Amino acid sequence: MELNSSFWTLIKTKMKSRNDNNKLLDTWLDPIEYVSTTGSADRPRLVLGVPNALHQYFVIENLQDKIYTEISDTYGKPFEVEFSITGNKINSHIETSTTPDEVLSGSEILQAQLARAQNIQPTQPRSSSDTLNSELTFSTFVVGKNSEFAHAACYNVARNPGADDYNPLYIYGPVGMGKTHLLHAAGNHIREQYQHLRITYISAERFMNECISAIRRHEMDKFRQKYRENSDILLVDDVQFIARGEAVQEEFFHTVNSFIDSRKQVILASDRMPKDIHGLEDRSRTRLERGLIADITMPDLETRIAILRYKAEKYNVRLPEDVVNYIARISKRSIRELEGNLKKVKMFSELQGLPIDHELVKRILAHHETQSTISVEEIMKLVADHFKVRVLDLKSSTRAKPIVVPRQIAMYLIKKFLDKSLVDIGKSFGGKDHTTVMNALERVKNLQAADQDIAKDIEDLEQRIHNITRV
């Protein structure tokens, strides 16, 4: 058996037969073409062509292992695979560009971009959203390994809005990582390049409130006209809140469908994947998963240093190198925390008339040296948000099951991550005694073993805590 074009066609066919998500494979596997076979007879190298850098990045991150496994099972001998950017078209309305008009910072993988495509025709004159922040652009976003795929996806969507392969674009990650920045950056880029398009940027909570108000006032036709007929680009932040109301979720589902059917671009941001949004209907989840999903996580130390340098220059603050490293090292929770610490140092220095040095900064930010990287209240908030209850309910004495289980899980997580005493944990929950806490910990361990859904809830919460606390 030779590694040739027929062999690669066979591999793609076998992969599709094993995979239920044919939409994913149609989008990402189909465009991969056989280019050549190089290397030695003992270890041939299969060179496969991909259309562009974004495609290359996605395949390497998400499909490479599956491709290797399928080839290994079929070929049965040593081999290598190389994914080479060849510029072949994905489809008739997306072409590659080797000379983008903006050079992205970060990895070289981001430098090949998709060309613009004029594929959205509005029926009315432009009426762009006034809520876009003009300072949040691609040029002011510091790209790191944690965000390069999300950044590249947003940038390519902004250059080519409405493309089937990237609609909707769904960005997810913990709070304060830059998701909102990317939404605004995409909106600003589209507004600059496609001045005839009408852009709507809105939070899911505001969409929900307006929808509920329209239902009460019997003004749904007006509401639908605003979001479906009078807009060409829809940018929605904090999508997880859509699941709070059945009627709102229904309206949101049809709004997103209307946009996609009309080849109008939808970009969504959330703190979790669609499958992890409690209360989200299956059809809504499926619709959100049918486009492109990109995650954004906490930046590593190197990227935090780069972000801090950029912010310091923006705020005209001169920081010694040891100060930059110190602030970046202790600011582990989010980019917002990083910027907040910089502003705190700047303000203290100006008010006291003192030069910024390592000793001063350590004094200003001393609480970071002794403070846990996540607090009791923050864990409570994570659990409350996850189960759609209030922190106040967790601290109450109610024995209702929808409250008791989240309360017990919160106690378990606080014990695991903060190692607080049973007495201290009890005090945090409205003065519960240590026996109650001890029973709660035992109860959660039993639930983890007996209930897969609860085990998954705890796993998700632990991962979110890890994302906040890791360096």
Swiss-Prot record:
CDD domains: AAA, Bac_DnaA_C. It is found in: Cytoplasm. Residues 77-130 are annotated as: Domain II. It holds the Pfam family Bac_DnaA_C. The keyword ATP-binding applies. Its main location: cytoplasm. The keyword Protease does not apply. Residues 1-77 are annotated as: Domain I, interacts with DnaA modulators. GO terms for biological process: DNA replication initiation; regulation of DNA replication. GO terms for molecular function: ATP binding; ATP hydrolysis activity; DNA replication origin binding; lipid binding. Residues 350-471 are annotated as: Domain IV, binds dsDNA. SMART domains: AAA, Bac_DnaA_C. Residues 131-349 are annotated as: Domain III, AAA+ region. ATP binds at residues 176, 178-180. Keywords: ATP-binding, Cytoplasm, DNA replication, DNA-binding, Lipid-binding, Nucleotide-binding. PROSITE patterns: DNAA (PS01008). GO terms for cellular component: cytoplasm; plasma membrane. Oligomerizes as a right-handed, spiral filament on DNA at oriC. Domain I is involved in oligomerization and binding regulators, domain II is flexibile and of varying length in different bacteria, domain III forms the AAA+ region, while domain IV binds dsDNA. Plays an essential role in the initiation and regulation of chromosomal replication. ATP-DnaA binds to the origin of replication (oriC) to initiate formation of the DNA replication initiation complex once per cell cycle. Binds the DnaA box (a 9 base pair repeat at the origin) and separates the double-stranded (ds)DNA. Forms a right-handed helical filament on oriC DNA; dsDNA binds to the exterior of the filament while single-stranded (ss)DNA is stabiized in the filament's interior. Belongs to the DnaA family. This is Chromosomal replication initiator protein DnaA. The lineage of its organism: Bacteria, Pseudomonadati, Bdellovibrionota, Bdellovibrionia, Bdellovibrionales. The gene is dnaA.
